[in-house]
């Protein structure tokens, strides 16, 4: 059997490594470099270039040169508005999917990524002198289910069996801690790359690498800092000459390369000159762009980006349930951590000098290679325990999201819960699978939907539908639903057809905090309506069963209170619903007392209305939750 290689498939650059004996080795590519630009170019003659060769010709061939494709992996066209503006190449809407159009041919992001992976695969094969068919590929910790699946698909297109998808900060921790297996440390991995930011808190000890929490922003990286410089120099030139350089693809590509170069230079210098001769021309002649950019100015125009790294850090430390002083090391990963302001922010936030002992460009690939060695059996006494970054659940009564798996749960994991129907004689249920942190289903991301049919007709709350969530070691979700009475089962593997945008996934947690009061109020309104609905249902049922035993005057008053609650339920406020419920319950208390004294069905007289029937209260026994499912009328088919 051949080697399992480790690949860091980055937004800006990619890297490949392999275990050689007990040590990981980063492999140089055919140009003699240890990292390869994640760039693919298509020439006018039809040749395909990957890596440095593609990057070199980008200025003269911007519309046919693809970079930062990782930002489009596993995403729909309507989710990539901002990224689309930054790309000089053509992005099209292909049946809702974001695709790249080159010379009248359409490519999926997975296909473009596969071309980069093929370059990594060939690099490893040249080094090892043997065919490579298996790999461990890294992804940002905050990549969602669709993006992870898209990464696996890219590997498959490249001719690789992806043995494991591993989170980038976790891979970095593996590389950092491989020679410290007997030590016990709490480590924060601060990973700021070309397109994404992750922060993970891990506990290392006796060969166990346990992720305690992870957070991040999948729309924050070196590309965004480059864009700040592009916008700054373009606006300065526009002030001087009245021309917006960003409207021409070739000029925009020149600006991008100049911005990236300036950013890198400002990591070691206090200022840099951006000099682009013959950047454009007017009737007066050629125009040249010459702008001096200081580090202070760069930090000022990028202030909002620098500030964005702090909130994920705060959440990660809080969710890890540790004190800041307990963190022993802060390991910097990703090329963007070379920015002095980032290093200063990390030092200020964590109260200690960041650890720069690992190569930020190579450490993730090294960690992936180590994981490959673990899977192969070449590396022993290492156990990796990772987590899922966002909560997973289903929609239940009233549009509430009921979580089955909480964020930062160790994976692989399997959770199940029993739900029930929301209507009498309901013969089919729809399971609406969600990912996110907001209380309401509509505010979270739909991962998929599927139906379970042929449920025997029964009063609502009686059928028992067991929903099972199963996350594998790659962080990919499998969901199934089973009717416990008939044993009939339906399942779904959440595929890459349902995707989150890079901005959305981080926005979920931010919104959960910013709109906490609004969410709480909306959830209370739903809970009250659910309770009112249950009280109406049980009152109607018991009126039918006990009608003749209830005194006429009290029955009339009860029916009046019931009508009042029905009206409040349809048209009233939360307060009016509460008032009507109190009135109806008061009527029942009086009737229950009379029935008890007469011995006529006192045990049945008081209907029990669940207080939170939309999320966790029982209706029908066996801990079943009233779930809002779509009723399918089979007669209309």
UniProtKB/Swiss-Prot annotation:
Residues 598-619 have a biased composition (Low complexity). InterPro entries: ATPase_NBD, Chaperone_DnaK, Heat_shock_70_CS, HSP70_C_sf, HSP70_peptide-bd_sf, Hsp_70_fam. This is Chaperone protein DnaK. NCBIfam families: PRK00290.1, PRK05183.1, prok_dnaK. Acts as a chaperone. PROSITE patterns: HSP70_1, HSP70_2, HSP70_3. Induction: By stress conditions e.g. heat shock. It holds the Pfam family HSP70. The modification Phosphothreonine is found at residue 196. SUPFAM superfamilies: Actin-like ATPase domain, Heat shock protein 70kD (HSP70), C-terminal subdomain, Heat shock protein 70kD (HSP70), peptide-binding domain. Belongs to the heat shock protein 70 family. Residues 503-525, 598-637 are annotated as: Disordered. Keywords: ATP-binding, Chaperone, Nucleotide-binding, Phosphoprotein, Stress response. HAMAP family: DnaK. One of its GO terms (molecular function) is ATP binding. The gene is dnaK.
